[in-house]
From Swiss-Prot:
The modification N-acetylmethionine is found at residue 1. Residues 428-438 have a biased composition (Polar residues). The modification N6-acetyllysine is found at residue 140. Residues 1-156 are annotated as: Necessary for mRNA 3'-end cleavage and cytoplasmic accumulation. It comes from Pongo abelii. This is Serine/arginine repetitive matrix protein 1. Phosphorylated on multiple serine and threonine residues by DYRK3 during the G2-to-M transition, after the nuclear-envelope breakdown. Phosphorylation by DYRK3 promotes disassembly of nuclear speckles. Citrullinated by PADI4. GO terms for cellular component: spliceosomal complex. The modification Phosphotyrosine is found at residue 610. The modification Phosphoserine is found at residues 227, 234, 240, 260, 389, 391, 393, 402, 414, 420, 429, 431, 436, 450, 452, 463, 465, 478, 524, 526, 528, 530, 532, 563, 565, 574, 576, 597, 611, 619, 621, 630, 640, 642, 650, 652, 708-709, 718, 720, 726, 728, 751, 753, 761, 765, 767, 769, 782, 786, 788, 790, 794, 804, 808, 810, 815, 887, 914. Residues 300-702 are annotated as: Necessary for speckles and matrix localization. The lineage of its organism: Eukaryota, Metazoa, Chordata, Craniata, Vertebrata. The modification Citrulline is found at residue 7.
Length: 917
């Protein structure tokens, strides 16, 4: 059948398999152009491929990659056969479509090979047209975009202009309420500054401007609750009458009352006026301005805080007023007068404390010498007063101090270079500390100033500060220390405010122990709750304000403390040597902070501000915290100490925590009351000579930030500052926690010097009260506050630092070494506190060496300050560790009080002799 096939006939030989392409070539019709050959090497195939793809898709109605690739492959040959391509494509495309396709493709290839670029001229023309069209379209789009952009710009400009108008209308309002209030007040305040002190008016103005809302609210809470919402300075001031004094009277009062202080302090003030006024004015102006702009938000925050807290503050003022009323009219009047006079006096006394530190110190020391007894009133009322009526406190300060302040200022004015510096440092540290920790400082100031005993403490502080200074540059140091203290006093004075308040209030608390404890617990919870806001606000605004006020030169001390201050705080801890005296004093006020659980808040705020400012200041709160920023910046402090965060948390969240820590603090305050029993003796001792130390001891935590920042008081102050740093952390959670570490510090400091012993003992009384507080409320206080301060606070190292600073020989190294050892030694100190009470000085020496090694790594400068403070506090340290055990504390309280009083009298006499001589 197919024999031929099997016979070997090939398909080529078989006709049946003849080349069909020949037939197809004969049969198919081809376009004429296909006759021409194309050299694909001259053709840019990549340009033609898109056209082929498009064309095949049109013919087939769908995109067939196989056909397209088949065509591409055929064209890749150098000389493709156009007819064969058409025959091959006929199967895919119809014969007709294939013919049309090849008829269109080949001319493109021919034109492409003729073109230099290998691109068909048609494509070039198309491209040109496309380009033209694109250009036209682009131009249209560009014109449209321009129009849209113009419209957008116009809209934006309109919006911006409207916003600017709104902002201007708002900012003037804000600035009117905030910066204008400082400016408005600053005009009289500037006059008053010129009169009383370049600083105090502006501190007032700043406190008024930064704290116009907070202060007004503080005033309102300070005044009656009704005036709290009123926010009207006149109403609130009228209600407080010290607020009224605040604007007109505080300055006039300080002017007449502080004239002698001002005369002496005016010399310094004029020095400071030249420098501080330029600073306080330039800084206060720039800061007032910057505060009005930059702090308008913080002020808003303060306002909102003061508003949001004003309820709390209102309750706390109510509570505080009731405690004040409970405490007696002393509390009631001292709070308004003291607090308000303090806010002015603080402001002024920050200025006047720095400027007329002697007047403020005399008033504070006068307030102090009585405060041993009045401290009850002033301690709780002043604290309350401080918080409630910062401005009220100043009038009283001025009223009380005015008579005593004038003589002591003179006494202190002769030492004014040193004592004025110290008084300014201590007073400034107290009042600035108060300003920074308004509540604490207000109380401290109130206590110092509200109780006329303050003069003795002041002399003691002067003697101690002078002893600490040892004749450090009196005028130069006073100016430098004023400057530094303006910065550091915001920290240290808040601490000193706390410690003085704590010291005065410790005696006050010891006197007011039960009633005051309840009241202070009540108030301190409200303080912890409402004052925590207030502290925030007052610390934020007060710190910012009072720090701002006080630091009007360092106006932003609040800010500085908060944002810029964080480094300054550490700087203040370690670098500012002059500040330490303030910090010593500042520590004394912080004890008030400690003694009052709210003051601990203040302390915690001031410690927060201080140690956190030290740490916080690194963070800048922003505006914080001192403390919206101040609360957040305090978180730095708090952040630095994890317990300080607790305090800070205690501040806003822990108003409950604070109330619990405050309760703990109150139980510490109970312990601190026991210790206030001891602390009263301490505060009596320290109130006189150790009162600065007490301020250290109470304030060690607050002071830890402050003192650690200043090396001069560094030993006494730095140890307590470092204590404050660690204690201030612990103070934040619980001041007494810090005290527990502080006893260690105190023991270490015990050997260095009587003053350091005093301050160490004051620190110990601080730490002692914290420890009993930690021991009595140990579960809440010591674990949370002492342990978390010491353990949680790696920043708490300052507490150990405070301990470490005690080694006066190498305060920085020892304090630094001790800083590391302090945490460990906090625990050890807690264990050894009883032994330490008896073996204080020996153990303190050993612990100093150990803590010095540990603290050496921490902060040499802060440690130096802590060592100075510890060395000074150590004499008191022995009594204070006893106080630390509260059971022993109560027994030892009488002995300690006598001992402290004797020491205070000695230091007072020394201070009087050295200032006068």
């Amino acid at each position: 059948m197919d024999a031929g096939f099997f016979r070997g006939t090939s398909a080529e030989q078989d006709n049946r398999f003849s080349n069909k392409q020949k037939k197809l070539l004969k049969q198919l019709k081809f376009a004429e152009c296909l006759e021409k050959k194309v050299d694909m090497s001259k053709v840019n195939l990549e340009v033609i491929k898109p056209w082929i793809t498009k064309r095949v898709t049109e013919i087939l109605g769908f995109e067939d990659d196989v056909v397209i690739e088949f065509i591409f492959n055929q064209l890749e040959v150098k000389n493709p056969d156009s007819k064969m391509m058409q025959i091959n494509l006929t199967g895919f495309l119809n014969g007709k479509n294939a013919r049309e396709f090849m008829g269109e493709l080949w001319p493109l290839l021919l034109s492409a090979q003729e073109n230099i670029a290998g691109i068909p001229s048609a494509f070039l023309e198309l491209k040109k047209e496309e380009i033209k069209q694109r250009q036209i379209e682009q131009e249209k789009l560009a014109s449209m975009k321009k129009q849209d952009e113009d419209k957008d710009k116009r809209d934006k400009e309109e919006k911006e202009s409207s916003r600017e108008k709104r902002e201007r209308s708002r900012s003037p309002r804000r600035r009117k309420s905030r910066s204008p209030s400082p400016r408005r007040r600053s005009s009289p305040v500037r006059r008053e500054r010129k009169r009383s002190h370049s600083r105090s008016p502006r501190h007032r103005t700043k406190s008024r401007s930064p704290s116009p809302a907070p202060e007004k609210k503080e005033k309102t809470p300070e005044l009656p609750e009704p005036s709290v919402k009123v926010k009207e300075p006149s109403v609130q001031e009228a209600t407080s009458t010290s607020d009224i004094l605040k604007v007109p009277k505080p300055e006039p009062i300080p002017e007449p009352k502080e004239p002698s202080p001002e005369k002496n302090s005016k010399k310094e003030k004029e020095k400071e006026k030249t420098r501080p006024r330029s600073r306080s004015r330039s800084k206060s102006r720039s800061r007032t301005r910057s505060r009005s702009p930059s702090h308008t938000r913080p002020r808003r925050r303060h306002r909102s805080r003061s508003r949001s807290y004003s309820p709390r503050r209102r309750p706390s003022p109510r509570r505080r007023p009731s405690p004040r009323r409970r405490t007696p009219p002393r509390r009631m009047p001292p709070p308004p007068r003291h607090r308000r006079s303090r806010s002015p006096v603080r402001r002024r006394r920050r200025s006047s404390a720095s400027l007329s530190g002697s007047s403020s110190s005399s008033s504070s020391s006068r307030s102090r010498s009585p405060p041993k007894k009045p401290p009850k009133r002033t301690s709780s009322p002043p604290r309350k007063t401080r918080r409630l009526s910062p401005s009220a406190s100043p009038p009283r300060r001025r009223h009380r101090p005015s008579p005593p302040a004038t003589p002591p200022p003179k006494t202190r004015h002769s030492p004014t270079p040193q004592q004025s510096n110290r008084t300014r440092k201590s007073r400034v540290s107290v009042s600035p500390g108060r300003t920074s920790g308004k509540v604490t400082k207000h109380k401290g100031t109130e206590k110092r100033e509200s109780p006329s005993p303050a003069p003795k403490p002041r002399k003691v502080e002067l003697s101690e500060s002078e002893e600490d200074k040892g004749g450090k540059m009196a005028a130069a140091d006073s100016v430098q220390q004023r400057r530094q203290y303006r910065r550091q006093n915001q920290q240290s004075s808040s601490d000193s405010g706390s410690s003085s308040s704590s010291e005065d209030e410790r005696p006050k608390r010891s006197h007011v122990k039960n009633g005051e404890v309840g009241r202070r617990r009540r108030h301190s919870p409200s303080r912890s709750a409402s004052p925590s806001p207030r502290k925030r606000q007052k610390e934020t605004s007060p710190r910012m304000q009072m720090g701002k006020r006080w630091q009007s030169p360092v106006t932003k001390s609040g800010r500085r403390r908060r944002s810029p201050s964080p480094p300054p705080t550490r700087r203040r801890r370690s670098p500012s040597p002059a500040p330490p005296p303030r910090r010593r004093r500042t520590p004394t006020p912080p004890p008030r902070r400690r003694t009052p659980s709210p003051p601990p808040r203040r302390r915690s705020p001031s410690p927060r501000r201080y140690s956190p400012p030290i740490q916080r200041r690194y963070s800048p709160s922003p505006p914080p915290k001192r403390r919206t920023a101040s609360p957040p910046p305090p978180p730095k402090r708090r952040a630095s100490p994890s317990p300080p965060p607790k305090r800070r948390v205690s501040h806003s969240p822990p108003p409950k925590q604070r109330s619990s820590p405050v309760t703990k603090r109150r139980s510490p305050s109970l312990s601190s009351k026991h210790r206030k029993g001891s602390s009263p003796s301490r505060s009596t001792r320290e109130a006189r000579s150790p009162q600065p130390n007490k301020r250290h001891s109470p304030s060690p935590r607050p002071r830890a930030p402050q003192t650690s920042s200043p090396p001069p008081v560094r030993r006494g102050a730095s140890s307590s500052p470092q204590r404050r740093q660690s204690p201030s952390p612990s103070t934040r959670p619980i001041r007494r926690v810090s005290r527990t570490p502080e006893p260690k510090k105190i023991k270490k400091a015990a050997s260095p010097s009587p003053q350091s012993v005093r301050r160490v003992s004051s620190s110990r009384s601080v730490s002692g009260s914290p420890e009993p507080a930690a021991k009595k409320p140990p579960a809440p206080t010591s674990p949370v506050q002492s342990q978390s301060p010491s353990t949680n606070w790696s920043p708490a190292v300052p507490v150990k630092k405070a301990k470490s600073p005690t080694p006066s020989p190498s305060p920085p190294r020892n304090s630094d070494q001790e800083g590391g050892g302090k945490k460990k030694k906090k625990k050890k100190d807690k264990k050894h506190k009883k032994d330490k009470k008896h073996k204080k000085h020996k153990k303190h020496k050993k612990e100093k060496a150990v803590a010095a090694a540990a603290a050496a790594a921490v902060t040499p400068a802060a440690i130096a300050a802590a060592t100075t403070t510890l060395a000074q506090e150590e004499p008191v340290a022995a009594p204070e560790p006893k106080k630390e055990t509260e059971s022993e504390a109560e027994d030892n309280l009488d002995d300690l009080e006598k001992h402290l009083r004797e020491k205070a009298l000695r230091s007072m006499r020394k201070a009087q002799v050295s200032p006068q001589s």
